[in-house]
Amino acid sequence: YEISACLVGSEMCIRDSDHYKEANKQAELYDELADLVDTAAQTNAATEPAEQIPYSEEKMLLPELAELYQQNGDLVGWISIADTNINYPVMQSVNEPNFYLKHGFDKAYSDYGCPYVQEDCDVQEPSDNLVIYGHHMSNGSMFAHLEKFKDKGFWNEHRTITFNTLTDKQEYEIVAVFRTVVYTDSPDAFKYYRFVDAESTDAFDDFIAKCKELPFYDTGVTAEYGDKLITLSTCEYSRNNSRLVVVAKRITEDGGADAAKTHAEAAAENERPN
């Protein structure tokens, strides 16, 4: 019995050690990628812009994402949220839809995965709703910090999400933060991930209305047919098969802080008593 206990204990230590090594490895990988993106952006802003690399007949690659795209052609953008650990490349593998659930940016197997876009979403067109998944890791990495948005006070100071595609800088304003269950026919289940392109104004309005039925708090922000959305999704552990979801609408395509500020200030004005 003692020998068995020792063996079990040793195995647990090895697993803990492996998990620690994996966490450090992934942190280093994504820190390096973030540094590369930041350095490229700063260099491009401070000097004469380098010759741009075409992405399509109409569009050029953003200089800060060009090197990453050359490293991995599955890259579709970069997502970041102020005062969180969310600062990651975003991937999409259409032929292997959930590939990045268990693979990192370098395509090596990883429990941490890498944020990725649902396979039926078109980032460049774009679809009416881009669904982006990320793990909720216990060390606070990937999309774990979406938990912060359960607190209205945090949302009040962080109303926008930056999601730059390969060709465009884009800012999104948060419409709703909620949790729901998936993989069930329960009446309280909301299959938000099935909404990608609105077939009609009514379909879009129905999706927004459902988002507005479930939130932790009222943001005072809504969306209308023609708006482009992103939906961030991660695991939520208050019940089985629960998901934490953040839905936001695009407010600018050039990363303009003024537009984001204007929307945030308008929402703040709506909250103030007359």
Question: Model-predicted segments: where are they?
Answer:
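Short, small-residue-biased leader/transition segments that mark boundaries at the very start
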Residues: Y1-C13
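Solvent-exposed, non-transmembrane regions of membrane-associated and secreted proteins
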Residues: E11-N274
